Amino acid sequence: NGNAMSSGSNTAGDKDNLYIFPYDLSNDGGNTRRAKNQYLGSVFGLAWQRESRVLFMSAYLKRHSGFGPGGIGAIYQSQISTTGVPATPTLLVNVGTIGINVGTDPRITALPNDPKTPNTDVGVFAEIGKRGIGGIDISNDGKDLYIVNMFEKKLHRINIGNPLKSSFTATDV
């Protein structure tokens, strides 16, 4: 809840966002926090490129929860080591920069920095599921990332390469 890009203790940006846990976990206490909200904001889609051990996460329009640094069209990446410890998530690509129109952020009021502060976020309510990125998935060979564009109601394929490319252009779509 709140402005994901806020900084300082006890702000929305300081709250936990990404957790990992062992595959064979059988009791409580095995999950580990790996990222704060300020690095990701609201995310929904997840995809795993096993060869490079990269977890992809897509931004998601959600009421009362702001976007991370990449905005509405962001796809983030986090390298997960063999010990399960990921690197801090970073922006892989904002799909708007490679020709995919997922719409704009419909927020008409700023979200509060304090996650306990009530807010109305009225501009978002009617647009959930109509703007931004929905689910994401990766091809079996790990070379293509598929994204659901809820704004244009399309499925897009992005050639991300395997091993993972470091930059993308419209020709990768």
Kindly give the residue locations of the regions a language model identified:
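Sequence/structural signature of beta-propeller domains
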Residues: 1-173
